[in-house]
Structure formats: structure tokens, C-alpha cells
A protein has these predicted regions:
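Conserved subregion of the PPM/PP2C metallophosphatase catalytic domain
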Residues: 1-131
Length: 131
């Protein structure tokens, strides 16, 4: 099983993240969106394992996007993947909208890209936008 665990310290605007085999979260900060270089083994594979923790201080307008691989690895009828790059560009182009609106937009774009083909994997998004 994969998981991503995050804690948010509101007063300090500090986010800490650990990843257990989930897709790398995306961070929009200072006008650019990129992957958080954080990986780890899925839960339950090894009896004893430790996970790296990544931390950042966020500012108003910063956006963090947790997503399952069912977003980037969704394929269209030609076998092309939606891809992390397309997801990253959507976030950069629409960074001014709210988290709910961004989630709806991304899922609509994935549906349009796949031409509403049946789901082959889950499509999970959690979006945090700092106010």
C-alpha cells in the first residue's frame, strides 16, 4: 500500500511530508511548479524501514498537490499518458484559482484527455493552497 503523510503547522506556515511509495507531490512556489524529490518504499514491503522527511515554509499563494499515479499515468486511446508535465503546466497556468476549482479543473482535463474512457486506476487529488 502506498501513502503520503503530511503535517501542517499553521502558525509557522511549515509543512512536513513523508512519502511511502506514492507519486511525488508537486509544489507551486515563486511562479514555478515542480516535483518534491521525496520517495520511499510502499508500506508493508519491509519489516523495518525509515522514511525521509521533507519540510518547507510556505507563503500565501503557494500550492501543494498530492496526486495518485492514476492522474499522470492515465492514457488516452493512442496510448499517451496524461503525464506529470501536463499536470505541472495546468497548476502553473491556473495558480490563481482556489483549491476546489483547481481539483475540478484537473479532473475535467484528465477526462477530456482520455475521452471519458473507463477508469483503470483511482484518480485521487489533495490540493493545499496557502492563504
Amino acid at each position: 500500500m502506498t501513502a503520503c503523510f503530511a503535517t501542517w503547522q499553521k502558525g509557522r506556515q511549515k509543512l512536513r511530508v513523508a512519502n511511502a511509495g506514492q507519486s511525488q507531490p508537486l509544489l507551486y512556489k515563486d511562479g514555478r511548479c515542480g516535483k518534491i524529490d521525496l520517495a520511499g518504499f510502499p508500506l508493508g514491503i519491509f519489516e523495518e524501514v525509515s522514511y525521509d522527511e521533507w519540510g518547507v515554509t510556505l507563503a500565501p499563494g503557494d500550492i501543494l498537490v498530492f496526486h495518485s499515479d492514476g492522474i499522470a499515468e492515465t492514457a488516452n486511446s493512442e496510448g499517451q499518458f496524461f503525464g506529470t508535465e501536463r499536470l505541472r503546466k495546468l497548476i502553473e497556468q491556473h495558480h490563481e484559482i482556489g483549491a476546489k476549482e483547481m481539483s475540478d479543473l484537473i479532473l475535467r482535463e484528465v477526462d477530456w484527455f482520455t475521452q471519458s474512457a473507463p477508469l483503470s486506476d483511482d484518480r485521487t487529488l489533495v490540493i493545499l493552497k496557502v492563504r
